[in-house]
Amino acid sequence: LFSSRKISETDDIINPATGKTGGTIFNNAPCFGSNWGIGYAKRIKTFFEKTGFDIWENDGPFPGDQCASTSHPGHHGLEDSQWVQFNMQKELYHWLNARGVYINSPDWYFLDGANKTGLGYREVNFSLPRENQRILNRQNIFDALWEQNPAMGWGFVPLTAYQGGGKDAVLEPLHEHIEDYKQLMMQYYGAGIQACYRGPRLYDTEETKQTVIDVIQWYKKYRGILNADLIHLRRADGRDWDGFLHVNAQESGIKGLAMLFNPLKTPITRTIEIPLYYTGITKQAKITFGDKTVKTVTLDRFFKSKLTVTIPAESYVWFTVE
């Protein structure tokens, strides 16, 4: 953890508006150009040199903090503080990249060498009831993957209370909310996104454990296509179906995988237009629902096909395209 905490009056960011510490983007934060900040970069390097670790999960620094200090050894004053801190971070990321360290960063630092960042979310949303969280989760996935591919993102699964909301907002005890738990896993892994669990355990009964195993085995089986680029079919709004389609024309077997969701309390049947141009398929496609039902569809001149699908209440279906 770098940001969102106080180190000392001499090492923290000096707020240009007040001349005091505090009041940064996330209240308190150290300055990378302070003695502590310079030492932080050195300690990170020493740690990876000595341990051989190859993953760095870091929270901060966040972009934009300017420091009005004139006594920090790393920068002259306010005017160069932001620039210097960006470059110090960039140098550290490049150093880690050169050693093959995988970087999960707190912001959009991909051009500096980061490998993954959060999808974007509001912490207060994790206080909402589980059924609302499922919809918001799909909205976050849908919106984030306009700008990044699935492997670039991660998202929360709050197993225990985050900020509030009571029993309706949490997944614990997991065995009592196993369907919600499974669907949140399937939404993330089905989008090819890493799920980050906020809680003390991944399962609490043998049934819950088997559910986790089943989902992870499913992900591993289809990992190739699940990490492929994603086509947005319909954004979740809680009023009708929503979904997305992974596509990769270079895959030798499965060239597409779609997930369709039904937020309503009754089953729905919809005829959905599936765009298959980026699968590389030109004439006919084999659609397989959940490893079972197989259907052959013909593509039109725009490489699309209409598919009639029934989606269970408050649930989902998935199918592969070959």
Language-model features: locations:
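C-terminal beta-strand-rich structural cap/linker in extracellular carbohydrate-active enzymes
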Residues: 298-322
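Short beta-strand segments at enzyme active-site cores
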Residues: 1, 56-58, 103-106
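Active-site groove signature of glycoside hydrolases
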Residues: 41-74
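Short acidic, glycine/serine/threonine-rich loops at helix termini
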Residues: 2-5, 11-14, 67-71, 115-118
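Active-site beta-loop-alpha junctions enriched in small/polar residues
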Residues: 3-5, 61-63, 108-110
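Active-site-adjacent "subsite" loops/lids of carbohydrate-active enzymes
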Residues: 1-53, 124-130, 138-141
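Glycine-rich tight-turn/loop motif centered on a GG-T
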Residues: 72-83
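Active-site-proximal substrate-binding groove within the catalytic cores of carbohydrate-active enzymes
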Residues: 88-294, 308-310
